[in-house]
């Protein structure tokens, strides 16, 4: 689940597109597209992409909640390149030749935009590629957790992770998405004037950096980021010394007592999730806490009482025929109810908007009453200037599709070539619907399209091939649809910063190629160093089991559910739809108190501790806003990103130490007093 950053939620796209920063951007000299893609920029994007891939992988393999990191990526891109251009003048006497070279090529907002786009395309592969969900669901451990004897979970329906096939799979499906909607970029960005709120917010941030006032603000943000990065990294290093055994260290600190700790109610001192809580809205964090109380505080203790009646008493709790089955399928029910509701809602909004635009176009053939400010016209002119031929997009799409149709069935024998053909034929239609809906609502529905594809391909594949076919089909559709929407989102940022579509496409392609290599390598490092997918450990990777169970449901239907699980799951599905209806139809002053179903669902499998961490982040933001609202609005994203990056980057040396069999020297553990 990806949560929207509050600073993005507050952005008013209408005001942004006519602001003074935008006018200043339009007035300055815009470099040609080849000068916008620079070697120093690609090096910076590679470093940022690697750092954030490590962070994203940690988040995906622990809880699956991914906050929006685009704003902090833009900040890091600015920091890296501003430092690059100014370092020679500071380090060399008189500035040196390198300094004069830097002056010859100034750091522009266009270069900043391309670097941010490239870095985001790189690290997005960490969760968009399915390493915490559909791809991990293929491994043997998830196959065994789902129940070897479970109907539909056919024997041998697993594939262990490997660098070769994972890299090949990502290359086969990711680049096609870049060409999916390329011929429609003008229609979506200029003709329909879609806002793409997150893309607009990123453009505002980048435009703001490249003004005198914005540079002063950026200095404060950089200082806040570096301070919190250092604190977070040192704290993570300090914590490591106390984790020399099972259930040891500050990660298992029984903050509210041992009884609450057994039900996962404790603060685990994870600055990653404190930072994520600072970025996510208060509603997301409180929804997660509400879900934790409902599940671990009420539901699971009550269902545990039925052990021996509803489910066998002689099987481990991690079995799908035991308590874990109820946890898993009720979580799936909440997510599916939420996803289906929003899928129908966004599809309806998209259809209505397209119909209204069509009617307006017919009614105003001769005259157009819309007025454009000069800055808008200049943006449109720059956006259209560097033309990308449509034939190139069509030919590339056809060629890459043929490669995928040949390669994917070789990787997965259960996936027939015609499954891949169907996915690639549907991709442009689904991609346009998703890109248009994202532009209107800022909700990328690629995961929901992927889940629908999962059920269709799982049912189509039948009992023997259905699980693998469903999971792979889900990954194909999700990635095709997501990449095309992400590209339109980036084109919106480029449109507002006067960045060439060609340089944006090149940056996105380079970032995608980086991600296709970095993400599998990073995942395999984590996979070999830690116990990934253990439902009782830290690295729970809950979405892997959720996706596999959805594939089993697609194959077997409701016969796969434990006793009374169907009734309970149906109740949670209906509850999910109901609270979404309440959010849409209640007066605004009440709807902000209605929880979000998907945020509620994550603690069902993961536990309450991460929800408590995120609520601590919310509490910090709330208190800071009360004390100094202007300072908090400026520094919260930077401080939160520092916490996330410091704790997240420690995972890299930590995993290397684990692979080298270097164990922490101390185990700090808590037991009841005598």
UniProtKB/Swiss-Prot annotation:
Subcellular location: Cell membrane
Record-level Gene Ontology MF annotations: iron-nicotianamine transmembrane transporter activity; oligopeptide transmembrane transporter activity
Its membrane topology: Multi-pass membrane protein
Tissue expression profile of the protein: Expressed in phloem cells of vascular bundles in leaves and leaf sheaths. Expressed at low levels in phloem companion cells in the central cylinder of roots, but not in the epidermal or cortical cells.
Chain ranges passing through the membrane: 41-61, 64-84, 118-138, 162-182, 224-244, 283-303, 329-349, 392-412, 420-440, 452-472, 506-526, 559-579, 604-624, 633-653
UniProt superkingdom: Eukaryota
Annotated stretches, region: Disordered: 1-29
Region forming the signal peptide: none
Location (main, coarse): membrane
One GO cellular component, as annotated: plasma membrane
Positions with biased composition (Basic and acidic residues): 7-22
Pfam families, alphabetized: OPT
Single GO BP term: seed development
InterPro entries, per the entry: OPT, YSL-like
Swiss-Prot/TrEMBL keywords: Cell membrane, Ion transport, Iron, Iron transport, Membrane, Transmembrane, Transmembrane helix, Transport
Induction field: In leaves by iron deficiency.
Function comment: Involved in the phloem transport of iron and manganese and their translocation into the grain. Transports iron- and manganese-nicotianamine chelates, but not iron-phytosiderophore.
Family the UniProt entry places it in: Belongs to the YSL (TC 2.A.67.2) family.
NCBIfam families: OPT_sfam
Protein name: Metal-nicotianamine transporter YSL2
Lineage: Eukaryota, Viridiplantae, Streptophyta, Embryophyta, Tracheophyta
């Amino acid at each position: 689940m990806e949560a929207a950053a509050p600073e993005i939620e507050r952005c008013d796209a209408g005001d942004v597109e006519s602001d003074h920063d935008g006018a200043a951007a339009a007035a300055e000299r815009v470099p040609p597209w080849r000068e916008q893609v620079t070697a120093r920029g690609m090096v910076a994007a590679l470093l940022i992409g690697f750092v954030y891939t490590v962070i994203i992988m940690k988040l995906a393999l622990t809880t699956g909640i991914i906050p929006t990191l685009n704003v902090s990526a833009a900040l890091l891109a600015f920091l890296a390149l501003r430092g690059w251009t100014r370092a020679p003048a500071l380090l060399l006497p008189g500035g040196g030749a390198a300094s004069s070279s830097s002056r010859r090529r100034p750091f522009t907002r266009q270069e900043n935009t391309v670097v941010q786009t490239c870095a985001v395309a790189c690290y997005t592969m960490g969760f968009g590629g399915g390493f915490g969900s559909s791809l991990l669901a293929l491994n043997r451990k998830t196959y065994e957790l789902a129940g070897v004897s479970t109907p539909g979970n056919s024997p041998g329906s697993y594939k262990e992770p490997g660098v070769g096939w994972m890299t090949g799979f990502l290359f086969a499906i990711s680049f096609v998405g870049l060409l999916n909607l390329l011929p429609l970029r003008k229609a979506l960005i200029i003709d329909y004037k879609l806002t793409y709120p997150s893309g607009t917010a990123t453009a505002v941030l980048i435009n703001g950096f490249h003004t005198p006032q914005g540079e002063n603000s950026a200095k404060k943000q950089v200082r806040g980021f570096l301070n919190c990065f250092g604190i977070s990294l040192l704290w993570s290093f300090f914590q490591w010394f106390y984790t020399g055994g099972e259930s040891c260290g500050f990660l298992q600190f029984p903050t509210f007592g041992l009884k609450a700790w057994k039900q996962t109610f404790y603060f685990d001192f994870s600055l990653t999730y404190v930072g994520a809580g600072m970025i996510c809205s208060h509603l997301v964090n409180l929804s997660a806490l509400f879900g934790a109380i409902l599940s671990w505080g009420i539901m699971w203790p009550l269902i545990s009482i039925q052990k021996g009646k509803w489910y066998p008493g002689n099987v481990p709790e991690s079995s799908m025929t035991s308590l874990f089955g109820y946890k898993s399928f009720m979580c799936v029910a909440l997510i599916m109810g939420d996803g289906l509701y929003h899928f129908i809602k966004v599809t309806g909004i998209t259809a209505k908007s397209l119909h209204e635009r069509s009617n307006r176009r017919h009614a105003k053939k001769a005259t157009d009453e819309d007025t454009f400010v000069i800055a808008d016209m200049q943006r449109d002119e720059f956006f259209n200037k560097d033309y990308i031929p449509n034939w190139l997009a069509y030919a590339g799409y056809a060629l890459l599709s043929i490669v995928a149709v040949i390669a994917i069935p070789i990787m997965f024998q259960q996936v027939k070539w015609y499954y891949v053909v169907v996915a690639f034929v549907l991709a442009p239609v689904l991609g346009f619907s998703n890109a248009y809906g994202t532009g209107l609502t800022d909700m990328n529905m690629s995961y929901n399209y992927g889940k629908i594809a999962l059920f269709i391909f799982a049912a189509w594949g039948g009992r023997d091939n259905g699980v693998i076919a469903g999971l792979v089909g889900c990954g194909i559709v999700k990635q095709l649809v997501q990449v095309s929407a992400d590209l339109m989102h980036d084109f919106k940022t480029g449109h507002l910063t006067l960045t060439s579509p060609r340089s944006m496409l090149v940056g996105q392609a380079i970032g995608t190629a980086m991600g296709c290599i970095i993400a599998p390598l990073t995942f395999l490092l984590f996979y070999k160093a830690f116990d990934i997918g253990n439902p009782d450990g830290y690295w729970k990777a809950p979405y892997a089991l959720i996706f596999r169970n959805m594939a089993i449901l697609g194959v077997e239907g409701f016969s796969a559910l434990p006793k009374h699980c169907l009734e309970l799951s149906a109740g949670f599905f209906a509850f999910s739809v109901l609270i979404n209806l309440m959010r849409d139809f209640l007066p605004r002053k009440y709807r902000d108190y209605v929880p979000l179903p998907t945020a509620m669902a994550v603690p069902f499998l993961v536990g309450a501790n991460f929800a408590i961490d995120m609520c601590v982040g919310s509490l910090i933001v709330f208190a800071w806003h009360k004390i100094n609202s202007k300072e908090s609005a400026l520094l919260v994203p930077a401080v939160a990103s520092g916490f996330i990056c410091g704790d997240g980057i420690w995972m890299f040396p930590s995993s290397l130490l684990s692979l080298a069999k270097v164990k922490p020297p101390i185990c700090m553990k808590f037991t009841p007093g005598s």
